[in-house]
């Protein structure tokens, strides 16, 4: 079972060209499901039924995952099983017919212009990294990029 997991992650990296963060998220989700299956115990991807999937949803709910996280788990596992079907490892995808409503969309939190200006002005510039930090905050504000995107920038 671990072999198929590794093949899928390699497929995401090489053929789908997913980012390392996305691949890591898929890995985490599939590993969580694998850990659950070993406790049940289920010893083959082919043994998983729609009933097992529904029970797993209950487990995720009891572990206090929120709706959007559970939807992400389902999406990851649906994609993984699609891969397994395409490769002939399993005959059917038990996740294909299972749906789960996402939670309400949250509006993103944001700063007003005057709040950002106060924050940038609070970086006094007396310490060696202040200039860099000020520039980073200004780049974040001006472009709207995520912190994860900013950390991946190279000069």
Task: Label every model-predicted segment.
Residues 1-155:
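Conserved catalytic core of the tyrosine transesterase superfamily
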């Amino acid at each position: 079972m671990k072999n198929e997991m590794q093949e899928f992650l390699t497929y995401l990296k090489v053929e789908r060209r997913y980012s390392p963060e996305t691949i890591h998220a898929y890995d985490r989700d599939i590993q969580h499901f694998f850990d659950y299956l070993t406790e049940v115990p289920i010893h083959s991807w082919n043994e998983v039924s729609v009933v097992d999937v529904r029970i797993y949803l209950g487990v995720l709910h009891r572990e206090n995952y929120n709706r959007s996280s559970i939807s992400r788990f389902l999406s990851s596992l649906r994609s993984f099983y699609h891969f397994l079907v395409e490769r002939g490892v399993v005959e059917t995808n038990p996740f294909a017919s299972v749906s789960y409503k996402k939670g309400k969309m949250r509006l993103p939190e944001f700063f007003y212009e005057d709040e950002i200006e106060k924050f940038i002005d609070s970086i006094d510039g007396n310490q060696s990294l202040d200039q860099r930090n000020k520039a980073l905050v200004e780049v974040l504000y001006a472009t709207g990029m995520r912190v994860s995107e900013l950390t991946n920038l190279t000069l």
